[in-house]
Amino acid sequence: STHGINWDVGYPYVNKAAFQTLRDDWGANAVRLAMYTSEYNGYCSGGNQAQLRNQIYKGVKYATELGMYVIIDWHILNDGNPMTQLAQAKKFFATMSNKYKNQKNVIYEICNEPNGCSWTSIKSYATQVIKVIRKYDKKAIIVVGTPTWSQLGSDGTHNEVANSPIKGYKNIMYSLHFYANEWSHNKYLPAKLDYARKKGIAVMVTEFGMSAAGGGGGINSSYTGKWLGKLNKYNISYFCWSLSNKNESCSLLSSKTKKTSKWKTTELSVAGRYIRSKYRARKEARSEEHTSELQSPLNLVCRLL
C-alpha cells in the first residue's frame, strides 16, 4: 500500500518504475492507492479533487500496464463514520466505476477504517455505495471496511460482520487490518478471522503493518511471520503499510532513501527488508506449487499479495 497519495510521503511512489520494482524484485502482484478523505489535503477536506483523481488514474494505468491488480482506497480514518462522506463517496465511485467498468484488475475499497460507529451504519453506507458501483461495474470486487478500524466487528470478540453480511450482491469482501506489534490484534483477530471463514464471508487484508497501529515504535517480526503464514495458508490477500520513506518503523523504505524505485536492500527499512523477503519467498512457493496448474481468474484473485 502507498501512504496517503495526498502527501509527499505517498504520491512520489505512484510511478511505473516503483510498481515494476515491487512486481519484479519483491514478487508483488497488486498495489493499493490510499487516498485520505479527511486531514490535510484530504479529498473531502479541501484537497484538490481533480489532482487527487489524477493520481488514482496514473496509479491504475501503471498497475494495468504491468499486469497488476490495483485497489482504489477511499481512506476513511479520522472521519470515523463513512456516512459523513456518503455524498462525496457516491460521486467518486460513480466516476471510478464508470471509467474502469471494462477492467478486471481494479478493486474498490469503499471505506478504509471505520471507527466510532456501528456495523449497521457502515452497512447502510456500503449498500448505497455498492449500488452506485454496480450501476456501472457489475462484477468488480468491492471491499467493505469493518468496525473498529477494520477488525471485523466492534472490539475484541464481536462478530457483527460475519453474523450479518451484506445481502443481494456478489463479489463483496470485507477488510481485516492488523498491526503485528499490537497485543490485542494478535490476541483477538486470528479467532475473528477463523469465525468469518467458518461463516463463509470473504476477507481481504487491505492493510497490515509490522509496528503498532500508530506506525511507530518497535516492529514485531515474530507475529508478522505468524500472521503471514496464516494468510498464505488460507489464500488471503494482504497489503503492507506502507511504501514510503516517512520516518516511522512501519515504512518499507529507509527515511534516508530518496529514490522512488529500484531500491537496493540497503535502501529499505528493517521492515522493508523483512517484507521483501517474505513476498519473494511466497512468490517462489506459489510458482513451484502451481507450475502445472492453469490459474483461473478466481485463483489469481485469491492469491493477491
Task: For the regions a language model picked out, list residue spans one by one.
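N-terminal module-boundary/linker segments of secreted carbohydrate-active enzymes
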Residues: 1-6, 286
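Extracellular glycoside hydrolase catalytic/binding regions
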Residues: 4, 8-13, 86, 90-98, ...
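Aromatic-lined substrate-binding rim segments of carbohydrate-active enzymes
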Residues: 15-79, 86-91, 95, 127-136, ...
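Short, cationic motifs built from Arg/Lys/His that form the positively charged side of catalytic pockets
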Residues: 32, 134, 207, 294-296
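Short, function-defining helix-loop hinge/capping sites that tune catalysis or transport
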Residues: 40-42, 81, 117-120, 215, ...
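Hydrophobic "anchor" residues on beta-strands that sit immediately upstream
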Residues: 69, 203, 289
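Low-complexity, Pro/Thr/Ser/Gly/Ala-rich linker/spacer regions in secreted
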Residues: 280-292
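Positively charged, low-complexity/disordered segments
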Residues: 293-305
